[in-house]
Amino acid sequence: MNKIVVVGAVAGGATVASQIRRLDQESEIVVFEKDRDMSFANCALPYYLGNVVDSRNKVLEATPESFYEAKNIVVKPCHKVTSINDTENTITVYDRIQDTYFETHYDTLILSPGCSANSLNLDSPIAFTLRNMEDTDAIETFIKENQVKNALVVGTGYIGLEILDNLYERGISPTLIHRSTHINKLMDQDMNQAILDEMDKRDIHYRFNEEISKVVGNAVHFESGKVENYDLIIEGVGVKPNSEFIKNSNVTLDDKGYIPVNDQFQTNIPNIYALGDIITSHYRHVDLNAHVPLAWGAHRGASVIAEQLAGDHKIHFKGYLGSNIVKFFDYTFASVGVSPKELSNFDYAMVEANQGEHAGYYPGNTKLHLRVYFDKTNRRIIRAAAVGMKGVDKRIDVLSMAMMHKLTIDELVEFEVAYAPPYSRPKDIINMIGYKARNK
């Protein structure tokens, strides 16, 4: 019997196993997960800690038992793959519960081990990272048992911003620090001013160019010389790929430890595939490699791999657009396309508009700031970013579709808006971007 082994059982691994079973009722499918829990909604973790998601069961989407019963897929949690022998088509697995190692064979191997949270190595019982359900349960238990009143959040990526927002809404007073002034790096830095405004409005303290030197009890010592007491520290300081077990195999890794894949999500070894946060691929709209560790790519990868294994070789991955979005209190920040740093690869022009999200006379109108970058040579859109209280997601999604179909900046004047006063304006902000681009 054909045996498919999957490494990792969260977004990428659980989804690809499920998609394969949908098309293939015969193959044996075994999934190894190094952690305790499978198929949890990791994007929900900050919202669960903020009591926005009101039940732990809503975060856990499946268990090994329910997965096997529904799909005839074996999931083995607390089983860490430690090495790959791609010559013999075997892997070595460490069973954390039994404290034993064993080898198992595969015909097809699919790698979705994800990433681990970077740690500041503070050696403190009040310091936590947030990456999985075990982290989440530990933080939730700590908050309840210690009646946490205040918290220090380190880092201004999505985890840092979302956990700060949710701790505040839970009634815990947060302070934010970051090691530089460069925050929320997927956004243009001047468009992040609303992050500072939202914290100022709520008297939330924040400091940039600040780092922790040590923690003694509840006393946090900073590089600036300040010493402040906190009940809880949550670190959101980036991630690293879980690729140590791959390094002694023939599977190619890039210089950061990620796995390059082709448009079928194959590695350089034909019967080994990879998906999720562990991979690098390419952008759809421009000729650049891309690492986009977000949920959409993992789910798209799962579908492509399943179709490939089922024999439909017409299905290929056309690339990322990098659409991303985050809520921070009353504001939404979103972008699509290359990162601000990657813009240096292009001869580009930029056009922006800052106007009411819907008709000015209709109540509740708020400002929406939209910025679009385009290639001067072919006038195709290469990046867009938006910030506002309403309508951000709609505009970024429209621009994502425009980029998917390689529309030029000038064609945005032809975008036909679904207009009524509560929703937009007769000349939407996307139309205005197109009109303004005529002068560029």
From Swiss-Prot:
Pfam families: Pyr_redox_2, Pyr_redox_dim
Cofactor(s) essential for the protein: FAD
Transmembrane regions listed in the UniProt entry: none
Enzyme class, broadest EC rank: oxidoreductase
Family matches, as Gene3D superfamilies: FAD/NAD(P)-binding domain (3.50.50.60)
Residues spanning the signal sequence: none
Binding sites annotated in the UniProt record for substrate: 15, 19, 22, 39, 42, 71, 299, 427
Binding-site residues for FAD, renumbered to this chain: 8-33, 267-277, 419
Residues that bind NADP(+): 151-166
Catalytic reaction(s) noted: NADP(+) + 2 CoA = CoA-disulfide + NADPH + H(+)
Domain of life: Bacteria
Record text on cofactor binding: Binds 1 FAD per subunit.
Active-site positions on this chain: 43
Keyword annotations from UniProtKB, A to Z: FAD, Flavoprotein, NADP, Oxidoreductase, Redox-active center
EC number assigned by the record: 1.8.1.14
GO molecular function: CoA-disulfide reductase (NADPH) activity; flavin adenine dinucleotide binding; NADP binding; protein disulfide isomerase activity
Annotated domain remarks: Contains 2 FAD binding domains and a single NADPH binding domain.
Function: Catalyzes specifically the NADPH-dependent reduction of coenzyme A disulfide.
Family: Belongs to the class-III pyridine nucleotide-disulfide oxidoreductase family.
Xref: PANTHER family: NAD(P)H SULFUR OXIDOREDUCTASE (COA-DEPENDENT), PYRIDINE NUCLEOTIDE-DISULFIDE OXIDOREDUCTASE DOMAIN-CONTAINING
General remark: Reduction of disulfides occurs by a thiol-disulfide exchange reaction, but involves only a single catalytic cysteine residue that forms a stable mixed disulfide with CoA during catalysis.
Record's subunit section: Homodimer.
Protein name: Coenzyme A disulfide reductase
Species: Staphylococcus saprophyticus subsp. saprophyticus (strain ATCC 15305 / DSM 20229 / NCIMB 8711 / NCTC 7292 / S-41)
